[in-house]
Swiss-Prot record:
One MF annotation (Gene Ontology) recorded for this entry: GTP binding
Originating organism: Arabidopsis thaliana (Mouse-ear cress)
Keyword Acyltransferase among record annotations: no
Residue stretches making up the Miro domain: 15-182, 427-595
An example Gene Ontology biological process: pollen tube growth
Annotated positions of the Phosphoserine modification: S14
Chain residues that bind Ca(2+) 1: D211, D213, D215, E222
Protein name in UniProt: Mitochondrial Rho GTPase 1
Functional description taken from the UniProt entry: Mitochondrial GTPase required to maintain proper development, morphology and intracellular distribution of mitochondria, which in turn are essential for the progress of embryonic cell division, development of haploid male and female gametes, and pollen tube growth.
Name of the coding gene: MIRO1
Cytoplasmic face residues: 1-619
């Protein structure tokens, strides 16, 4: 199980090339080191800065193209060096063994400078000119570098070399390349001396994929299948027994009567890494499609399936929904239609992290009394992620075990523009933009949509927020996504021509007891309607008269009714979040969204534009009819003339 397969670098996620940038003080031997490593000889004369040097593919056993970039030490070239560092995969930082001040400059200038530039890549420290070091100053490399490496954890390794004596010059770049192909950082925490969480999650997923009979242990046959997949050679029975014995001696629960448990599997990889055999763990990860970030490589998520027009969206397919239903039942241990937070964490334990722990997903769905998710809420969360981040949704479906082709997990909907023309919609997921002035009741509306109790101390939000839930409509459940747009976020929304393309319906909430709130909501309605007319992404709209439990402004009632009639949309829907009276609002929103040709407001500018277009069309029609009459007249005249000529 510890054999290394060089072919692993050909797997998805493997770096396809390595770019190494060499930096350090003037006169520390940067250029000489590069030439000595590349040509196996010492150069008597080298230019101040070498051109980029490409090593042959066969130079190192991994067969990865390596480019070495020399840099200038002149202060005026710092910007150029900084740009090269930002493009690098690894850094070789040099000092001269015969000049102690260049060693001091590593921690005084170079390493802090790399941090300032946010160069988050492996660093190899190379002590050059080893042959020039004073024989009376034979301090060990470990003694010199240990304090620096404790302070700067980004240093992967240190090595002393001599270009003149051809001593370890090539090894400097071999180690640099190795830190790119098999970095320690993503796998192992040096402080805690333990595997990092993301590495544990990836290895757990690999274990589950290899545990074909799902009995929680890798049998001898399953271990051999794993070995052949990763290392192209089976294990001998004695080797399998040796692996089990090593694990059992250190971790008894790592082996049971059925084979190697997941705990034992993780222990083995921690052991490989502690012994410096990172290539073993990286080979396994690469074979299962992981990149250096311990995420699935982009090649495994074909970008073609995520192409769409701005007014199209993505939804889960029936195959994905059936799979998610099965996963929900599997992790809902007591089958009480309540997936508890820990059960959700267990579900995503084979993903790099739980995708729902941060905005916009955190608190976006209705919770049960125990803080969990019902199946409807669980599926709603997946629908929200599929609409907002389809690639992330598919990626997480793969992490939790979706068995089919990723392209069968989601489907692209018909264009909304075409829905309006056909006057019908086949969508199952609808997005509603919620506009309104501050303190109008938008946040309270979203909270109540999620079944949460009303509170008088509801704080206004300055950030966009999502709420998602299922709504029953004519005996069928549809998913409604409410997107709250803060008042000061409206202009930012309009910075993109396609900002309304993803909107199925817009609602405008105002405080019915505050005349200024109604006026501002009306302004927002006109702004959105104007923008929709100008960009071609017109959307159905509804006005929502909130806080109906308070005394309504008489002017607001009269004017809002007149205004909605003038614009050709439904009268405002009165609601009270405090009293829990929503007047079937969410069903009305869904109904309007499913009839995209109705409830579209017309502004005065829009009416004028349509009137103008009708006049133009009539004029063109008149011209066409007149032209047709002329053509018919000419044809009749020619027939008449021909007959007259014949009779003569």
């Amino acid at each position: 199980m510890a054999r290394y397969a060089a072919g692993a670098v050909d797997c998805p996620g493997s770096p396809k090339s390595v770019r190494i940038v060499v930096v350090g003080d003037k006169g520390t031997g940067k250029s000489s080191l590069i030439v000595a490593a590349a040509t196996d000889s010492f150069p008597p004369n080298v230019p101040p800065v070498l051109p980029d040097y490409k090593l042959p593919i066969e130079f190192f056993p991994d067969g990865i193209p390596v480019t070495i970039v020399d840099t200038s030490s002149r202060p005026e070239d710092r910007d150029i060096v900084a740009e090269e560092l930002k493009r690098a995969d690894a850094v070789v930082l040099t000092y001269a063994c015969d000049r102690p001040e260049t060693l001091e400059r590593l921690s005084e200038y170079w390493l802090p400078e790399l941090r300032r530039l946010e160069v988050k890549i492996p660093i190899i420290v190379a002590g050059c000119k080893l042959d020039f070091r004073d024989d009376n100053n034979q301090v060990s490399l470990e003694q010199v570098m240990s304090p620096i490496m404790q302070q700067f954890r980004e240093i992967e390794t240190c090595i002393e070399c001599s270009a003149l004596k051809q001593l370890q010059a090539q090894e400097v770049f071999y180690y640099a390349q190795k830190t790119v192909l098999h970095p320690t950082g993503p796998l192992f925490d040096q402080d805690s001396q333990a595997l990092k969480p993301r590495c544990v999650r990836a290895l757990k997923r690999i274990f589950i994929l290899c545990d074909h009979d799902r009995d929680g242990a890798l049998s001898e046959a399953e271990l051999n299948d794993f070995q052949v997949k990763c290392f192209h050679a089976p294990l001998q029975p004695s080797e399998i027994e040796g692996v089990k014995r090593v694990v059992q001696e250190k971790l008894p629960e790592g082996v049971n009567e059925r084979g190697l448990t997941v705990t034992g599997f993780l222990f083995l990889h921690a052991l490989f890494i502690e012994k410096g055999r990172l290539e073993t763990t990286w080979t396994v990860l690469r074979k299962f499609g992981y990149n250096n970030d311990i995420r699935l490589a982009e090649e495994l998520l074909p970008s073609a399936i995520f192409k769409r027009a701005p007014d199209q969206s993505f939804e889960l397919t029936n195959a994905a929904i059936d799979f998610l239903k099965g996963m929900y039942m599997l992790f809902d241990d007591d089958q009480d239609n309540n997936l508890r937070p820990q059960e959700i964490e267990d579900l995503f334990s084979t993903a790099p992290e739980s995708p729902w722990k941060e905005a916009p997903y955190e608190d976006a769905a209705e919770k049960t009394a125990l803080g969990g998710l019902s199946f409807d809420a669980f599926l709603s969360m997946w629908s929200l992620m599929t609409l907002l981040e389809p690639a992330r949704s598919v990626e997480n479906l793969i992490y939790i075990g979706f068995p089919g082709d990723p392209s069968t997990a989601i489907r692209v909907t018909r264009r909304r523009r075409l829905d309006r023309k056909k006057q019908q919609c086949e969508r199952k997921v609808f997005q509603c933009f919620v506009f309104g002035p501050n303190n109008a009741g938008k946040s309270a509306l979203l909270n109540c949509f999620l079944g949460r109790s009303y509170t008088d101390n509801q704080e206004s939000t300055t950030d966009e927020r999502y709420a998602v839930n299922m709504v029953d409509e004519s005996g069928a459940k549809k998913t409604l996504i409410m997107r709250e747009i803060p008042e000061d976020g409206v202009q930012g929304l309009f910075s993109s021509k396609e900002s309304l393309a993803a909107c199925d319906i817009a609602v405008f909430v105002y405080d019915s007891s505050d005349e200024s709130s109604w006026k501002r909501a009306t302004q927002l309605l006109v702004e959105v309607a104007n923008y929709g007319e100008a960009t071609g992404y017109e959307v159905p709209c509804l006005m929502v008269s909130a806080k109906d439990d308070l005394d309504s402004s008489p002017i607001s009632i009269q004017e809002s009714t007149r205004m909605t009639q003038d614009m050709g949309i439904e009268p405002p829907v009165s609601i009270s979040s405090k009293l829990g009276d929503f007047n079937n609002l969410f069903r009305k929103i869904l109904t309007a969204a499913q009839h995209p040709h109705l409830s579209i407001p017309e502004t005065e500018a829009g009416k004028s534009r349509k009137h103008y277009n009708r006049l133009i069309n009539r004029s063109l029609m008149a011209v066409s009819i007149g032209a047709a009459a002329v053509v018919v007249g000419l044809a009749a005249y020619r027939v008449y003339a021909t007959r007259k000529s014949s009779s003569a």
